Curated annotation (Swiss-Prot):
Keywords carried by this UniProt record: Antiport, Golgi apparatus, Membrane, Phosphoprotein, Sugar transport, Transmembrane, Transmembrane helix, Transport
S-S bonds: none
Bilayer-crossing regions: 7-27, 31-51, 75-95, 100-120, 132-152, 154-174, 194-214, 224-244, 250-270, 280-300
Underlying gene: UXT3
Compartments where located: Golgi apparatus membrane
Source species, domain of life: Eukaryota
Organism: Arabidopsis thaliana
Similarity comment: family membership: Belongs to the TPT transporter family. TPT (TC 2.A.7.9) subfamily.
Protein name (record): UDP-xylose transporter 3
GO MF annotations in UniProt: antiporter activity; UDP-xylose transmembrane transporter activity
Length: 357
C-alpha cells in the first residue's frame, strides 16, 4: 500500500470516528440534559477534557505515543482560546433563540474561509465555494426556524464565531508548524482547556440555568450517563484534532453539519421528534452540498498530486545540467590549468529565508 493510500485510509478512518463518536455523545447528552435535567453543559465539558487528559496520560505511560514538548506559550494560548470558544458558544445558545444559534454555527464556515484567505493566502476555488453555499443553504433550511435578535446575544455569537474559527485554524497550523501529531497537541493543550472551563463553568451554568451544579441531586442514573459521556468524549476530542490535522478547519465544519443532519434524522426515526418536509428538504440539499464538496476536494487533491509528480522529474533533470546547477549555487566552473574542473560549493544558508517573499 502506497503512502497516499495509507493517508486516504487514515483520513476516512478519522472522519468515520468523528461522526460515530459525535452522534453517540449527542444522544448520551440528550438523555442527560433533556430527560434527567442535568443542564450544566460547560461544567460537563470541563469534565470531558479532564477525563481526556487522564486517558492520554495513561496512553503515554503505556508508550502508545511519544511526548513532544514545544512552545509552551503557544500551547497555553491555544488551550485557553479553545476553552473560551466553548464557553462563548454555550453563552450564545443561552442568550439567543435556537434559530439564531444555528445561524451562528452556519457562520463559522464563511468566517473560516475569510480568515484563511486574508491571513494565510489560501485559495478556495469557485467550485468549492459553490458546494459550501449549497451545504449551508441546506442546513439553514433544515435547522433555522425563528430568528430573534438581541444586542448581547449578537455580540456573544460574533465572539463565539471568531474564537471558534481561530482555534480551529490554530489546531491545523500548530500541528504542521511544530510537526506534532493530533494526540501530542491534544495531550498538551487539554489541561489549559479543562482549567479554563472548570473555573468558569459553574459560574456560566449558574448564569444560564439559575441552578448550582454542586447542589444538583446526583442519582446513580445521572452519574452513569455523566461517566458514559466523559468516556465517549475522549474519542470525540481525539477525532476532532485528528480530522482538522489531516484535512482542514473547513472540512471539519462540513463534517459537523453532516453530524447535525444525522442527529436530526436519528431524532425523527428513533425518538419521534417533530419533523416536516422543510427538514427533509434541507437535509437532502445539505447532503448534495457535502457530496459536491467531497467530489471537488478529491479532484483538486488529485490535480495537486499530479502537478507535484510532474515537477519532480523536471527538478532532477535541472540538477544534471551544470549551467543550471551553477546558477543555483550547487556548483562553479573554474579553470584548473590543464582543463575545466567542476568544484562543488555548498549553497549559502540564509537563516531569514522564511521571512522573505
Amino acid at each position: 500500500m502506497s503512502e497516499g493510500q495509507k493517508f486516504q485510509l487514515g483520513t476516512i478512518g478519522a472522519l468515520s470516528l468523528s461522526v460515530v463518536s459525535s452522534v453517540s455523545i449527542v444522544i448520551c447528552n440528550k438523555a442527560l440534559i433533556s430527560t434527567l435535567g442535568f443542564t450544566f453543559a460547560t461544567t460537563l465539558t470541563s469534565w470531558h477534557l479532564l477525563v481526556t487528559f487522564c486517558s492520554l496520560h495513561v496512553a503515554l505511560w503505556m508508550k502508545m505515543f511519544e511526548h513532544k514538548p514545544f512552545d509552551p506559550r503557544a500551547v497555553m494560548g491555544f488551550g485557553i482560546l479553545n476553552g473560551i470558544s466553548i464557553g462563548l458558544l454555550n453563552l450564545s445558545l443561552g442568550f439567543n433563540s435556537v434559530g439564531f444559534y444555528q445561524m451562528t454555527k452556519l457562520a463559522i464556515i464563511p468566517c473560516t474561509v475569510l480568515l484563511e484567505t486574508l491571513f494565510f493566502r489560501k485559495k478556495f476555488s469557485r467550485k468549492i465555494q459553490f458546494s459550501l453555499t449549497i451545504l449551508l443553504l441546506g442546513v439553514g433550511i433544515a435547522t433555522v426556524t425563528d430568528l430573534q435578535l438581541n444586542m448581547l446575544g449578537s455580540v456573544l455569537s460574533l465572539l463565539a464565531v471568531v474564537t471558534t474559527c481561530v482555534a480551529q485554524i490554530m489546531t491545523n497550523t500548530i500541528q504542521k508548524k511544530f510537526k506534532v501529531s493530533s494526540t501530542q497537541l491534544l495531550y498538551q493543550s487539554c489541561p489549559y482547556q479543562a482549567i479554563t472551563l472548570f473555573v468558569t463553568g459553574p459560574f456560566l451554568d449558574g448564569l444560564l440555568t439559575n441552578q448550582n451544579v454542586f447542589a444538583f441531586k446526583y442519582t446513580s442514573q445521572v452519574v452513569f450517563f455523566i461517566v458514559l459521556s466523559c468516556l465517549i468524549s475522549v474519542s470525540v476530542n481525539f477525532s476532532t484534532f485528528l480530522v482538522i490535522g489531516k484535512t482542514s478547519p473547513v472540512t471539519y465544519q462540513v463534517l459537523g453539519h453532516l453530524k447535525t443532519c444525522l442527529v436530526l434524522a436519528f431524532g425523527y426515526v428513533l425518538l419521534r421528534d417533530p419533523f416536516d418536509w422543510r427538514n427533509i428538504l434541507g437535509i437532502l440539499v445539505a447532503v448534495i452540498g457535502m457530496v459536491v464538496y467531497s467530489y471537488y476536494c478529491s479532484i483538486e487533491t488529485q490535480q495537486k498530486a499530479s502537478e507535484t509528480s510532474t515537477q519532480l522529474p523536471q527538478m532532477k533533470e535541472s540538477e544534471k545540467d551544470p549551467l543550471i546547477a551553477a546558477e543555483n549555487g550547487s556548483g562553479v566552473l573554474s579553470d584548473g590549468g590543464g582543463g575545466v574542473q567542476q568544484k562543488t560549493v555548498a549553497p549559502v544558508w540564509n537563516s531569514n529565508k522564511d521571512f522573505q517573499a
